[in-house]
């Protein structure tokens, strides 16, 4: 069985924990888009591990970890991550494979990203400044440097020379920044070449072999669906496609080979950086939510904006991803709230709407229409049995399923992989506890 697991909001939904939990049954985990701008936080027996590029299956012995062609790969970031894992006694290089078609993220991408955000000032998009956008620009413009280029040093030198000259024109003459030296960039890549070279290969072919052997494969998304470059809250989005279709194009695996699509969603909503957020709470409730949820970016450390669950945006996410199941995370964050609110419609320019507008100026003006439910005000932290869940919490989950039309198959009640209620087994159709 082949399963896509992705975020349904603006990222930070807890995908890493769920992927890690499910990898006990899989042969491989694939990253198919994004870069090192988002981190997946895993907590195993109290020990925290943050992964940025390497798939979350790396913490499971014997699981093959694949970086697909849809990822933009920073060699220094990758090597740093490998070294961090090795220091914890986790071997990486024997189980990690990088698509030869994967584009590399290089110093001029980072320089451009930072220069652009600085120029925009208060109107900045709110990127992480790690060069993701410029790297994808080079890919689309067909001037990108790919992992396979590391195998041909002479050709690589010429490509680096041309690309650096091109980007230096912008850096020096438009942004008034110091130009970069192509030879330094090339020399740095040569240092990484010998370490990365054994891991470069044909990821699409590997996936095909696993499929023919009827092995289980997980395709792990980064960021969230509302950050999709085409279908998200543009222009306040990331530079890749974060929705389910990208699992195919970003890995070289045919779309008809996917069996399920699981959407990870918090029991509330968070967002980092600028952009519309209809249910955002700027009052004490929002601060309480952020504190209880420890809502700070795992890579950037930036505080996350918090708000109530948005049924309207979630329905859009279900539609664009063809979700077959939902994983509800961080339910325990709501334990102390006397009242829980669900946004069931928007009021835009005096009109009640049930679909999120793609026009961001209109979305900015939308106000949430709430349905109020009683809170449970008792701890759900660490629960593993649905029958032990407070009645009010079960009512909240049932109401979400009713409004969304998709089953909530897994509930996360804490950060550790053990803090989980499995209502429906992922790799078969057996219902273990419906409640």
From Swiss-Prot:
The prosthetic group or cofactor this protein requires is: Mg(2+)
Pathway given in the UniProt record: Purine metabolism; AMP biosynthesis via de novo pathway; AMP from IMP: step 1/2
Main localization category: cytoplasm
In terms of InterPro entries, this protein maps to: Adenylosuccin_syn_GTP-bd, Adenylosuccin_syn_Lys_AS, Adenylosuccinate_synth_dom1, Adenylosuccinate_synth_dom2, Adenylosuccinate_synth_dom3, Adenylosuccinate_synthetase, P-loop_NTPase
Where is GTP bound in this sequence?
Answer: 11-17, 39-41, 304, 330-332, 412-414
Record's cofactor remark: Binds 1 Mg(2+) ion per subunit.
CDD domains associated with the record: AdSS
Q: Which residues bind substrate?
A: 298-304
Q: Quote the EC number.
A: 6.3.4.4
Q: Which reaction does it catalyse?
A: IMP + L-aspartate + GTP = N(6)-(1,2-dicarboxyethyl)-AMP + GDP + phosphate + 2 H(+)
Per UniProt, the keywords (alphabetical) are: Cytoplasm, GTP-binding, Ligase, Magnesium, Metal-binding, Nucleotide-binding, Purine biosynthesis
**Family membership:** Belongs to the adenylosuccinate synthetase family.
Query: Which protein are we looking at?
Result: Adenylosuccinate synthetase
Q: Give the source species.
A: Coxiella burnetii (strain Dugway 5J108-111)
